[in-house]
């Protein structure tokens, strides 16, 4: 495959802008600019209006043009493409800058928010289920069963590695293990914002009696920093896999010496459009059932939440293991997954970027916080890669799914990490990490807050701080003696 270059982008005879020629793409860019920036008439409140209408087709196309502009350029910047993540990462960061610093109108930002993760559009709720169903249905049944028995322990290994490395670096900056666990490890490894940091803040508030926002403000900042590290690590792991092929399964998570690896049903059966349509309908029906189960679970008031995507994963796994879905529909599901993962990723990355506040990252950018967050991410990745082969997983894919997809901002973070790593086919395992792994962290958070966020924690904190101070004095006793002598003189 020929390497992409800038020359082909500006050749009118080529069609390198997402399959569109340069003249057609420039025309589309002008139309989108008019739609977004040119004022027209008045809105319902009497304020200056525009041509923009926040419906699915308009927002899909506008974000596609934005994504193609910076995505195709990013894929051709030599160092950026090779080591940072290419067009996928450039689209994300440029969109984040545009959104944070008001380079697009507020009306457009609201429309993006609705398109991306708000009702009635919520493109993310179409994107992720399509990837989950397409991924899980095309996994060999025996391999799927084997993966479940080993994947949850792999997540636990990652959390352990993250905790140890985080506490080690935290000790250097005078932070106790409890502080690192509650304020760094839990929010970073907790399954994102909505399913992790928000419910954790409520748990913290119930134990301390203080406002939940007090814990959440710092948690969301540190999570934002870790999310950036996770995305960048995804791009670096992609590069590592290319440099060291023995470390990667090229998109396959499980090592299977019996050659019963993940099989692509599309190789065996050429799907028709009706098969893809059937797979899409099946995805919608399964999502409906998952939503019903999620609502019923919430009504039971068990004490911790299970996201509906957890039920979607479990239902799809059951259908695959039970072998009740015809191969032609599985082939259609694979085609559906390919469309979303390969041809709409820049659209979603643009939407994620526009709704990401760069200032959140800047606000928590103290050197100590940055280094602790980095240590947590690298600790999860490093320990997983060390044990992955013994647990029958490919190191690169294991580190991406069980490590980085635990250390990001949930569903959107999974998309960004897998996009940067070019491993979108691993979305089902990424969702296991974010949802089931996140639920496990909520349980851990509830236990930790019960012990260490109450009055008992204050006493423990004082004892540990005293121990830390004594350790520092011991390590620097000679220096202290000299300083004391000088002071006496």
Residues of each region from the PLM?
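Entry/N-cap segments of selected transmembrane alpha helices
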Residues: 115-126, 135-168, 222-223, 278-280, ...
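Transmembrane helix-loop junctions in multi-pass membrane proteins
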Residues: 32-52, 73-78, 98-112, 137-145, ...
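Transmembrane helical segments that form the transport core of multi-pass membrane transport proteins
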Residues: 282-379, 383-387
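Membrane-embedded hairpin module used as a gating/binding unit in multi-pass transport
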Residues: 23-40, 66, 214, 221-325
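Intrinsically disordered, low-complexity non-transmembrane regions of multi-pass membrane transporters
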Residues: 1-33, 43-50, 239-277, 324-328, ...
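Structural signature of hydrophobic alpha-helical transmembrane segments
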Residues: 50-65, 114-131, 183-186, 303-315, ...
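C-terminal transmembrane helix pair
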Residues: 27-30, 130-131, 368-489
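Alpha-helical membrane segments and immediately flanking helix-loop junctions
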Residues: 173-218, 225, 237, 250-257, ...
């Amino acid at each position: 495959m020929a390497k992409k270059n800038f020359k082909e982008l500006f050749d009118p005879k080529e069609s390198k802008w997402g399959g569109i020629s340069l003249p057609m793409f420039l025309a589309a860019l002008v139309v989108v600019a008019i739609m977004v920036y040119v004022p027209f008439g008045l809105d319902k409140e009497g304020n200056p209006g525009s041509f923009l209408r926040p419906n699915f087709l308009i927002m899909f196309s506008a974000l596609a043009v934005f994504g193609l502009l910076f995505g195709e350029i990013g894929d051709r910047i030599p160092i950026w493409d090779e080591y940072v993540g290419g067009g996928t990462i450039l689209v994300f960061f440029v969109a984040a800058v545009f959104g944070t610093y008001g380079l697009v109108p507020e009306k457009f930002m609201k429309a993006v928010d609705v398109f991306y993760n708000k009702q009635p559009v919520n493109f993310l709720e179409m994107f992720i289920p399509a990837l989950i169903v397409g991924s899980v249905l095309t996994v060999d049944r025996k391999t799927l069963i084997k993966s479940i028995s080993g994947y949850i322990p792999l997540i636990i290994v990652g959390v352990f590695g993250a905790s140890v490395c985080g506490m080690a670096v935290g000790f250097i900056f005078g932070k106790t293990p409890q502080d690192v666990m509650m304020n760094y490890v839990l929010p970073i490894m907790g399954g994102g914002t909505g399913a992790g940091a928000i419910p954790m803040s409520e748990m913290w508030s119930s134990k301390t009696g203080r406002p939940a926002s007090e814990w959440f403000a710092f948690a969301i900042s540190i999570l934002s920093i870790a999310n950036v590290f996770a995305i960048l690590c995804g791009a670096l792991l992609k590069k590592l896999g290319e440099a060291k092929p023995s470390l990667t399964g090229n998109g396959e998570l499980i090592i299977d010496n019996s050659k019963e690896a993940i099989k692509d049903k599309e190789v065996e059966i050429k799907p028709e459009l009706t098969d893809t349509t059937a797979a899409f309908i099946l995805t919608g029906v399964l999502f409906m059932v998952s939503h019903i189960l999620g609502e019923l679970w919430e009504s039971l008031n068990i004490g911790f939440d299970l996201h509906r995507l957890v039920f979607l994963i479990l239902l799809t796994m059951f259908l695959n293991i039970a072998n009740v879905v015809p191969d032609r529909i599985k082939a259609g599901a694979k085609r559906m997954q390919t469309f979303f993962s390969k041809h709409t990723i820049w659209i979603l990355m643009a939407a994620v970027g526009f709704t990401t506040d760069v200032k959140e990252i800047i606000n928590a950018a103290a050197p100590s916080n940055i280094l602790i967050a980095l240590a947590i991410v690298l600790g999860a990745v490093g320990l997983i890669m060390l044990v992955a082969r013994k647990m029958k997983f490919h190191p690169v894919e294991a580190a991406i799914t069980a490590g980085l997809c635990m250390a990001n901002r949930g569903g959107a973070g999974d998309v960004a990490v897998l996009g940067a790593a070019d491993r979108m086919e691993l979305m089902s395992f990424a969702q296991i990490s974010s949802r089931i792994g996140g639920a496990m962290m909520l349980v851990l958070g509830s236990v930790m807050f019960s012990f260490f966020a109450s009055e008992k924690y204050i006493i423990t904190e004082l004892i540990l701080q005293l121990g830390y101070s004594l350790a520092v004095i011991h390590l620097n006793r000679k220096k202290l003696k000299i300083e004391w002598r000088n002071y006496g003189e």
